């Protein structure tokens, strides 16, 4: 089995920075219906406290010959605004509430919020 980490990077979300908690949690529920809750995690892509030069560096590799703005534009190449319900790591509390409200029980919610990743990596042998 594998894992799918649901990204919270605004450019990856329905309605980008305006994505609602309910919409995000509904996406997770649909994925659980397809592949099972044990294969789902959160891949926050959270990058706080860094200047915009960091995202510019990430989008332009050492050998890039032209400027790449990724999902951004020349006019707005900075980090996108996070959804209001996940501006930093404290947003995991909002995710917990949202997942419970959408119908996940406590064990499933804890699995999605970290236990599944832990168990996945624990199972990898060198």
Which stretches of residues belong to each language-model region?
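Conserved, mostly hydrophobic/aromatic
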Residues: 4, 45, 109
């Amino acid at each position: 089995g594998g894992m799918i980490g649901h990204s919270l990077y605004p450019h990856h979300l329905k309605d980008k920075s305006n994505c609602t908690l309910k919409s995000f949690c509904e996406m997770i529920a649909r994925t659980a219906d397809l592949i099972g809750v044990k294969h789902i995690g959160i891949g926050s892509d959270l990058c706080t406290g860094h200047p915009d030069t960091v995202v510019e560096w990430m989008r332009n590799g050492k050998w890039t010959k032209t400027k790449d703005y990724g999902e951004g534009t020349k006019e707005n190449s900075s980090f996108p605004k996070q959804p209001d319900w996940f501006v930093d790591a404290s947003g995991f509390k909002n995710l917990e509430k949202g997942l419970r409200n959408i119908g996940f029980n406590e064990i499933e919610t804890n699995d999605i919020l970290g236990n599944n990743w832990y168990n996945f990596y624990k199972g990898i042998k060198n």
